Amino acid sequence: MRTAYHEQLSELSERLSEMCGLAGIAMERATQALLQADLMLAEQVITDHEKIATRSARAEESAFVLLALQAPVAGDLRAIVSAIQMVAAIDRMGALALHVAKTARRRHPQHVLPEEVNGYFAEIGRVAVELGNGAQEVVLSRDPEKAAQIREKDDAMDELHRHLFSVLMDREWKHGVAAAVDVTLLGRFYERFADHAVEVARRVIFQATGSFPEDDTVPGSR
């Protein structure tokens, strides 16, 4: 009986890891759609989002079934409660990639981004995808040290976001209010994507150690 239970726990981790992978792919494609004004790629992200939503619902259901039927304690209870929190975080990652793709679609055939911020978003997108891929890995490995590294890499995203904001506030900005609003919202989408990847890593650390990092700050509270 317990063997079957732990197999179900492993299957749940695999589902969560797969969801992280799909969210990372979605953000990578959404970024390319944004940078290249690629309508077909944006549409693909929008269409494929249903895969993440479906897997999210199934993973959440699996976690609640385990919680209700198995009455887990200690480490197993931590694993299931953390999994429920991860489902929500990964689901939001997918939704944020969807927002990026929808922005690219809405402005097509024009480019959303002024040329001077393209480089920022290429790098912001790269970091976001790297964080998503890192979350995918640690969900399976449950390695708290690697999970801590994801939290450290999020500093790069924060720094890029600060630089982007300074560009928007510069008196030399000449692209108007609408472009500034688009850039601000898009920057926020990427920042929140990273925050949710960090939340996944934070939950992995809790799963493995029974406590949150000593320097812990809940993502999004900064």
UniProtKB/Swiss-Prot annotation:
It comes from the Bacteria. Its main location: cytoplasm. GO terms for molecular function: protein homodimerization activity. It is found in: Cytoplasm. GO terms for cellular component: cytoplasm. It holds the Pfam family PhoU. The keyword Ion transport does not apply. SUPFAM superfamilies: PhoU-like. Belongs to the PhoU family. Homodimer. This is Phosphate-specific transport system accessory protein PhoU homolog 1. The lineage of its organism: Bacteria, Bacillati, Actinomycetota, Actinomycetes, Mycobacteriales. The gene is phoU1.
